[in-house]
Amino acid sequence: LKNDRRSFKDDPSELNEVVRQFPFTEDEAFRDSIEGSLFNIGKIYQQIEHNEELFPNPVVRGNFIWKEKDKEVTFSPTPNGRFKVAWMPDSDKRNVKALERGKKVAPFKDFGCGGVDSYDLDATVDGRGSKGALHMYNKFSMDRPSNMFVVEYASRPDLAKIFYEDVLMCAFFYGYPLLVENNKYGIVRYFEARGYDGYLMDRPRHLGSSS
């Protein structure tokens, strides 16, 4: 099949049909046919492949783990990771610690922040229940990618405390404060017990619950 593809390398339209009929990947199986199209589909896919080689997907899946608890977090890439990461700070801006009046706080609140949609109950037997979510966002800066989301997490580990610790490790790694959904108290109590409640932002008044 590879030889067949090579024989059509100078004919993008025919190559596209060969790829569609004998795909190597799921994406290839769902390619559009050249029939009835006003555009040169073969050339379009050829350009897409070229662009992907020039600019590979910047998002990496993986998990944050403690290399040394409460001292250093590392990121471990894995295809089934719970985190999707598009950007990381330079090594000297990772795992930075800060104290205010003896309390651990996020050192880089001016660089970015995170939003958390948590849950309080462990996974049910039938697997129902919404996922926990975390997004980390870079604020405007001239020194790093700005005004963009850099981390996405949408998963529901069997134990809620695994989710809480995932969120804590990510916040520790980036040094960003977190805004937690106001009716979820489990994660707040967890951060307090771990000594990291200084990483939690006060909820803006205009987002408070109506009385």
Predicted features along the sequence, with ranges:
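RNase H-like, metal-dependent nuclease domains and their acidic two-metal-ion catalytic environment used
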Residues: 1-203
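Small/flexible residues
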Residues: 205-207
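Conserved RecA-like P-loop NTPase helicase motor core
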Residues: 209-211
